[in-house]
A protein has these predicted regions:
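Short, well-ordered alpha-helical microsegments
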Residues: 56-61, 111
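Short, glycine/acidic-enriched loop or turn micro-motifs at the edges of active sites
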Residues: 10, 54, 78
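Gly/Thr-rich phosphate-binding beta-strand-loop-beta motif of the actin/hexokinase/Hsp70
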Residues: 1-18, 100
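Anion (oxyanion) recognition and catalysis
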Residues: 65
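Nucleic-acid-processing active sites and adjacent nucleic-acid-binding tracks
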Residues: 18-47
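Long, charge-rich intrinsically disordered scaffolds of nucleic-acid metabolism proteins
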Residues: 77-150
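Short glycine-rich phosphate-binding loop at a beta-alpha junction
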Residues: 45-56
Length: 150
């Protein structure tokens, strides 16, 4: 089994494969990441370790599900405690990816599975994102209206 630690952010995936630090764009389909994986590994032999970061980690979770890639989604509290136990203080995406990679030493193999995508939860998350955007726009327009009325 080949382990890959990934720190997920809005724009990028910071990846550590045990040897190299890499970076890929976090976008639907993750084409460049898939190309890298196929070139270097058999997808069935890979286990991806990452923390859930809400909407930002959804592309990665879907990618794993669609390509039958095993993943271990780390509870953020466990990851935080593991980082403290290692004595790491500096928080960069590269360091986080390396720490998530090291987390594989604590994982029971039976807990590494291909993620399942709940379509209803995905739809609700999309609605929630749209609603939050509409609220921000309303507040912004309200402030703009008040300023122009003065």
């Amino acid at each position: 089994m080949y382990y890959i630690g990934i720190d997920v952010s809005k724009k990028d995936l910071a990846v550590f494969d045990g040897k190299k630090d890499l970076e890929f764009i976090n976008q639907e389909g993750l084409k460049s990441f898939k190309k890298y994986l196929k070139k270097k590994y058999h997808l069935q032999e890979v286990a991806i370790i990452f923390e859930p970061t809400g909407v930002y980690s959804l592309y990665l979770k879907e990618f794993c599900a669609e390509n039958s890639i095993k993943a271990y989604i780390v509870n953020p509290k466990k990851s935080h405690n593991f980082t403290r136990a290692l004595g790491k203080r500096s928080k960069t995406d590269k360091i986080d990816a390396r720490i998530l990679y090291q987390f594989h030493k604590l994982i029971d193999l039976k807990d590494i599975k291909v993620p399942q995508i709940d379509q209803e939860a995905k739809t609700l998350a999309s609605y929630l994102t749209s609603y939050e955007f509409a609220l921000k726009q309303r507040v912004s327009l309200s402030h703009h209206y008040r300023e122009s009325a003065r």
